[in-house]
Design a protein with these regions (language model features):
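Interfacial loop-to-transmembrane-helix boundary motif in multi-pass membrane proteins
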Residues: 9, 61-73, 121, 125-172
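Flexible juxtamembrane loops connecting transmembrane helices in multi-pass membrane enzymes
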Residues: 276-310
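Alpha-helical transmembrane segments of multi-pass inner-membrane proteins
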Residues: 120-125, 139-163, 190-239, 245-256
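Membrane-interfacial helix-loop-helix modules of multi-pass inner-membrane proteins that assemble, modify
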Residues: 83-101, 151-201
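Hydrophobic transmembrane alpha-helices and their immediate junctions
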Residues: 223-225, 248-255, 262-266, 346-386
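N-terminal hydrophobic segments of proteins, predominantly signal-anchor/transmembrane helices
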Residues: 9-28, 45-122, 381-384
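TM-adjacent membrane-interface loops and short helices in multi-pass inner/ER membrane proteins
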Residues: 300-334, 348-351
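Transmembrane alpha-helices of multi-pass inner-membrane enzymes
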Residues: 18, 45, 377-384, 391-428
Length: 428
């Protein structure tokens, strides 16, 4: 691969990275899946073989893509083959949330299996692209995309404070028959204050939190202080349980690696305590409205999540043993958590493989400061998905997976010092 072609690949991703976090805008409004990032992802499957001529990293790219597709097809075909022979099995879809809710009778090769597979293909294409071609100079464009998303979110919140109406003029994505907006305008009332929950161009506040959490963590570990502070503020403005649980998980991970005396841990704890002491009544109402009511099932969101989880787990327990192992097929159901969604769709095999995909780099990467950031990002993403965000198709997830896998074979090249609690120095 000559220099010119390598430059084309670099520039291709730099443009892609800027729009990668955006999910509520469609280039072609009446065609689902035509977000700018998805178009870049799917086109890359054609562009890379042409530019690399199946040599070098291009060969590795094709190998990784085909390997993933092979595993995916095998798992689903095995599951579908069993279902086609088990003529006595007639699942009751009335208790679970199926993606294609117009069809409650088809068991084998449901339409949603194929439509959802296209989204997964875009996600995997992103993963193998970044895994094989990532360069550190891409980071500036990765952060640029995250900051643009955050700036637009701040604009929306400010617009609502001034004019008391939705200021989103970009989102155009819809679901179902076109009557359900892909961008949910939500407010939260805390005392006499009414705030719009920051969502930007991701659809809803929890999805913004899910998208931006790994960028925030990675910015800290790249020592991008201003960017990490800005993203932290936007995460707080989501008033999303996903954001707060993610922050708590990251704090615990920092304590695990760097101890309680770590400057960032101390800073977060001290700032949190000061804010709580100065605004105790406000904080009490805030925590009650955003976390406690949901966890205690006192609001509609918490009740719905708990019921869907239990319904999907009951549905899974009543499946034939072989189907419990290999699942009903990818894209059949979508609960409010990835754990029960994975078990129903792809069984124990799918759950185990998905878990290994995330934790292999967590155990393989050495403990450089940057690598610890990638590990923390993957852990936060994984548990956020399992608990509250059953969303596999957000490309930010696959971006950070690709970066982590890319760093495994060359972990001792750019960052050749293994940092520990005793010798890690963190600049303020």
């Amino acid at each position: 691969m000559n220099v010119d072609r390598s430059t084309i690949i670099d520039n291709y991703f730099k443009i892609w990275a800027v729009v990668l976090p955006i999910t509520s805008f469609l280039v072609i409004p009446f065609i689902q899946g035509t977000t700018p990032a998805y178009i870049f992802a799917l086109l890359s499957i054609l562009i890379i073989p042409v530019l690399t001529k199946f040599k070098g990293k291009g060969s590795d790219y094709i190998r990784d893509l085909l390997f993933f597709l092979y595993i995916y097809i095998c798992i689903n075909l095995i599951g579908q083959l069993y279902l086609s022979f088990d003529i006595k099995f007639h699942p009751d879809f009335s208790t679970v949330r199926i993606i294609d809710d117009d069809d409650i009778s088809t068991t084998v090769f449901r339409k949603s299996m194929f439509t959802q597979s296209l989204y997964l293909l875009a996600a995997v294409a992103t993963f193998v692209f970044v895994k094989n071609f990532y360069k550190p100079n891409w980071d500036n464009f990765i952060f640029l995309g995250a900051c643009i998303l955050g700036i637009y979110g701040i604009y929306e919140v400010t617009y609502f404070l001034l004019f008391h109406e939705n200021g989103d003029f970009i989102s155009n994505r819809t679901f179902g028959d076109g009557t359900y907006s892909g961008s949910f305008f939500q407010t939260i009332t805390i005392g006499s204050l009414v705030l719009q929950r920051l969502k930007s161009l991701t659809g809803e506040p929890s999805m913004y939190a899910f998208t931006i959490l790994p960028f925030w963590i990675y910015a800290i570990h790249k020592k991008k202080t201003l960017i990490s502070l800005f993203l932290f503020i936007t995460l707080m403005l989501t008033t999303s349980t996903t954001a707060y649980i993610g922050m708590i998980m990251y704090t615990l991970i920092r304590i695990r690696y760097f101890g309680v005396k770590d400057k960032i841990v101390l800073f977060l704890i001290v700032i949190g305590l000061i804010v709580c002491l100065l605004n105790w009544d406000f904080i009490s109402m805030f925590v009650n409205a955003t976390i406690l009511e949901k966890l205690s099932l006192s609001n509609d969101s918490g009740i719905e999540r708990f019921m869907l989880f239990t319904n999907h787990m009951d549905f899974y327990k009543n499946l034939p043993l072989f189907t419990q192992i290999f699942g009903m097929g990818f894209g059949v159901v979508r609960s409010t958590d990835m754990f029960s969604t994975l078990l129903v769709n792809n069984g124990v095999v799918g759950f185990v493989l998905f878990t290994l995909l995330f934790f292999y780099p967590v155990f393989k990467l050495e403990n450089t400061y940057q690598n610890i950031g990638l590990k923390a990002a993957l852990i936060v993403i994984y548990f956020s998905m399992m608990i509250s965000v059953p969303e596999y198709s957000y490309l930010s997830t696959w971006l950070f997976l690709g970066m982590a896998y890319n760093m495994i074979p060359k972990r001792n090249i750019a960052y050749n010092t293994s940092y520990t609690k005793s010798n890690l120095k963190i600049t303020g």
